[in-house]
Amino acid sequence: MRRVILTTGGTGGHIFPALAVAEEITRRYPKARILFLGGQYGPEADLAARAGLEYVGLPVRGVMGRGLRALAAAGAMGLGVWRAVSVVRRFDPDIAVGFGGYAAFAGVLAARLCGRPAAIHEQNAIPGLTNRLLGHVVQRVFLSLPDTTGVFPARRCVPTGNPVRTAIVAAGAAGAAGAAEKGGVSRSAHSRRLLVMGGSLGARAINEAVVAALPALRDAGVELWHQTGVADWERVRAGYKQAGISEARVEAFIDDVASAYTWADLVLCRAGATSVAELAVAGKPSVLVPFPFATHNHQLHNARHVADAGAALVVEQKDVSPGADGRPAVALDRVLVELLADRERLADMGRAARAMGRPQAAAAVVDGMEAILAGRGARGVR
């Protein structure tokens, strides 16, 4: 395997699995060149650069809405495919793999138009439009969840799990070893550490609910590490200051998420497929607030799957947002404080999360890529 294109964009839920696969390719093929093909408008350029990957941005946007906006987005997609074809011809990849999102449509379609083998990875039980379309033109469809197989041609589907970055896998393994030594509890019974994450772009509803809960969290001695997203960073920092909390780590984006998971006793976050996969590999109990406007409400599906396994509590966004009387239906502060105080329950939830983890998912995807290339008499050698 000499050259590989990984293509996706939009949110961390698509991007981070691609970065995990890039790590595994580099581990097996240290001399391989990996090109990350993304969009010009999302966070993928910065994240790829931090991972040390070559990057090309395409002028593509999601096809949303109607009328002129949809027409403009479709035109941009056409231009994106044309440019992606140029990139594929110049880079000459052995294989291209898409991870969903609008950029992946252009990248994978360009690879197939140029006669290159390609695959996609689907993180969710209910695929988005990009992967639904591409699933009929690629050699393999790698699935996080086996029950997604009915959407794609069965002969092309390979259940792999959702790839998680190496540092998180290592942190999860270390946490499991530490918990085993201490009978399932990984740190002091007095620890009250809450990690708040709204996804790679932040989550205003979660940010606002946590700021409202700060007085109770402060009084209960809860330590906080809070990823706010860029848009809400100053507003949330002001909320912490007003609550008299100066020791909390309040960051727009957490670069070292593996350390954040290791630090935390409990995680409050969205229920995107990649977040759920990371929580499982890290063995972390969670309170999940699904994004209610996700396509086909797939985050609620993800959250209930984790909750049914005993690894999470689910609180819907409408229940933590103020109602007509100005009060939320669910007192999030009480939920968090009571759960953080129950060490035995946290340990049980952590074990349940770890049992769901697929730490070898990235390796399974690269195995599948190798199988595609072996079937074509691939040029690259390890």
Curated annotation (Swiss-Prot):
Main localization category: membrane
Amino acids binding UDP-N-acetyl-alpha-D-glucosamine: 11-13, 124, 165, 200, 254, 299
Molecular function per GO: UDP-N-acetyl-D-glucosamine:N-acetylmuramoyl-L-alanyl-D-glutamyl-meso-2,6-diaminopimelyl-D-alanyl-D-alanine-diphosphoundecaprenol 4-beta-N-acetylglucosaminlytransferase activity; undecaprenyldiphospho-muramoylpentapeptide beta-N-acetylglucosaminyltransferase activity
Top-level taxon of origin: Bacteria
GO BP terms in the entry: carbohydrate metabolic process; cell division; cell wall organization; lipid glycosylation; peptidoglycan biosynthetic process; regulation of cell shape
UniProt keyword list: Cell cycle, Cell division, Cell inner membrane, Cell membrane, Cell shape, Cell wall biogenesis/degradation, Glycosyltransferase, Membrane, Peptidoglycan synthesis, Transferase
Topological type in the membrane: Peripheral membrane protein
GO CC terms, sorted: plasma membrane
UniProt EC number: 2.4.1.227
InterPro entries with a match to the protein in the record: GlcNAc_MurG, Glyco_trans_28_C, GlycoTrans_28_N
Biological or metabolic pathway of the protein: Cell wall biogenesis; peptidoglycan biosynthesis
Role, per record: Cell wall formation. Catalyzes the transfer of a GlcNAc subunit on undecaprenyl-pyrophosphoryl-MurNAc-pentapeptide (lipid intermediate I) to form undecaprenyl-pyrophosphoryl-MurNAc-(pentapeptide)GlcNAc (lipid intermediate II).
Family affiliation: Belongs to the glycosyltransferase 28 family. MurG subfamily.
Name under which the protein is recorded: UDP-N-acetylglucosamine--N-acetylmuramyl-(pentapeptide) pyrophosphoryl-undecaprenol N-acetylglucosamine transferase
Origin organism lineage: Bacteria, Pseudomonadati, Thermodesulfobacteriota, Desulfovibrionia, Desulfovibrionales
Protein's gene: murG
